[in-house]
Amino acid sequence: MNKLSHSVLWIVTVLVTAFNIQPKQEPIEEVIDRGLKASTEQALLMAKELETQNGRLPKTINKEGKLETSDYSWWCSGFFPGELWYLYEYNPTPEMKKYAEMYTDRVEEVKHITYSHDVGFMLYCSYGNGYRLTGKPEYKDVMLTGANSLATRYDERVGAIRSWDFNKKIWQFPVIIDNMMNLEFFSWASKASGDDRFRKMAISHADKTMLHHFRDDYSCYHVVSYDTITGMPHKKQTHQGAADESAWARGQAWALYGFTMMYRET
């Protein structure tokens, strides 16, 4: 047998051996199911941990390994109730529904918040999923009240929803890319109420953001502040990224979701 034949035989032997020792591929459905079961167990443990702490919601684990909590006013307050509703959708048990309703109730006061653009995050994740899965009319009422609260942050001269109220010496009317995530709430509110005002505000905000937040390479600024008289940008900066001209990864994700969603809705 010549050298070429030896080489070919060696390569074939290695490939056959490697193929035979590869672990059996687990069907993706089983991987997903296992992950959701683990998520359900962990979510229920968390829900029970804070069950007797009225009004409290999970926030983070600090460096000492202790659980930190928040009240309804934290911008992520609606995420845990939303998680419980998604897990209830996966496995609709009475226990999961009980906790989803309990933690959703803890963010009800968000409906009166007029100092933050995150009302969409906070209510649509929690009450939005609760309403989608149960059809409870009181959930719809909370969200429509919240939509009207959020609408107070829209300025006709700028054509967008104001994000923050701090740093007024630096920003006149700051709009952050994150705000695209709240437009889905307005889209729902228009359909649920028949009031086209919400939809028009969402479209105007998206158009304004598309026009002024993006660079030539389609990376986006974190903060664009508008002149409240002319409605035009006067500052383009970052508040959480590495630098004003950098592309903040989380902001890029907000933009991808927000504009994909607005394309779907329009």
Identify the role of each PLM range.
Residues 1-27:
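Bacterial Sec-dependent N-terminal signal peptides
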Residues 24-266:
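Glycan-recognition and catalytic cores of secretory/periplasmic carbohydrate-active enzymes
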